[in-house]
């Protein structure tokens, strides 16, 4: 369970969340709604450990383990995954290198070139991602839909416990939104949970939701 208790936080001495409490149950999906500036993305940043965001009160726990002082990498290894609103392009880093590095960070022993190739290529085939993408610079020249497919590929590869989708529909046309939603459905299992931050209900049609939270000015107004 991802448990948030009396969480307050600030950025540059400005309060952004005030006494937020909620339990995200394992294996269930949730949606967070709210206007721009309501605190939706701030909550995602706090869960994943973005150092720009300062917790002033309360705790974030994952399966009984307090995350407050853990680094973003430690939280990722514990099972937290975040998609980005604006996916960065990283020239000089091949997709294969990036995927292997994040896989090895969670593995007990590092994979070899050939062993990882055998792991990643079937997953790419499932998502209809061309194999030659592995040897391209990370996200450079990729369309919005292709970048989102790479994020779905990471979810399949890492099997995180809690997957936070922060405006994953950003920059996508209607057809691409529908396609990404269908791909996400294939990654949703009884062992993981999606926390979806979105304005578009198309993203919600393929995933069964347990609850919808409404944030307003850093406070939960409706559940």
Predicted features and spans:
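Conserved structural motif at the start of ABC-family nucleotide-binding domains
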Residues: 2, 17-19
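The feature captures the beta-strand-to-loop junction immediately N-terminal to the Walker
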Residues: 33-35
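Helix-to-loop junction immediately C-terminal to a conserved catalytic motif
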Residues: 48
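ABC ATPase NBD Q-loop/coupling interface
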Residues: 59-75, 139
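Q-loop/switch helix immediately C-terminal to the Walker
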Residues: 86, 92-106
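ABC ATPase C-loop
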Residues: 155-156
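Walker B catalytic motif
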Residues: 167-168
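H-loop (His-switch) and adjacent beta-strand-loop-beta switch element
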Residues: 208-223
């Amino acid at each position: 369970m991802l448990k948030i208790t009396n969480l307050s936080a600030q950025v540059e001495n400005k309060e952004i969340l005030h006494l937020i409490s909620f339990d995200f149950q394992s294996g269930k999906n949730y949606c967070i709604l709210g206007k721009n500036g309501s605190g939706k993305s701030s909550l995602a940043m706090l869960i994943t450990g973005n150092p720009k965001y300062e917790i002033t009160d309360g705790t974030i726990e994952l399966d009984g383990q307090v995350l407050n002082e853990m680094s973003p990498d430690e939280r990722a290894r514990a099972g937290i995954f975040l998609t980005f609103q604006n996916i960065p392009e990283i020239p000089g880093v091949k997709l294969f290198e990036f995927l292997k590095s994040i896989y090895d960070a969670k593995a007990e022993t590092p994979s070899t070139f050939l062993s990882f190739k055998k792991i990643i290529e079937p997953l790419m085939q499932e998502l209809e991602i061309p194999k030659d993408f592995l040897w391209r610079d990370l996200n450079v020249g990729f369309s919005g839909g292709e970048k989102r497919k790479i994020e779905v590929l990471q979810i399949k590869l890492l099997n995180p416990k809690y997957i936070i989708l922060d405006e994953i529909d950003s920059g996508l046309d209607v057809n691409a939104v529908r396609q990404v939603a269908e791909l996400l459905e294939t990654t949703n299992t009884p062992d993981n949970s999606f926390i979806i931050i979105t304005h578009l209900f198309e993203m919600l049609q393929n995933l069964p939701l347990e609850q919808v939270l409404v944030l307003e000015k850093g406070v939960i107004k409706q559940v």
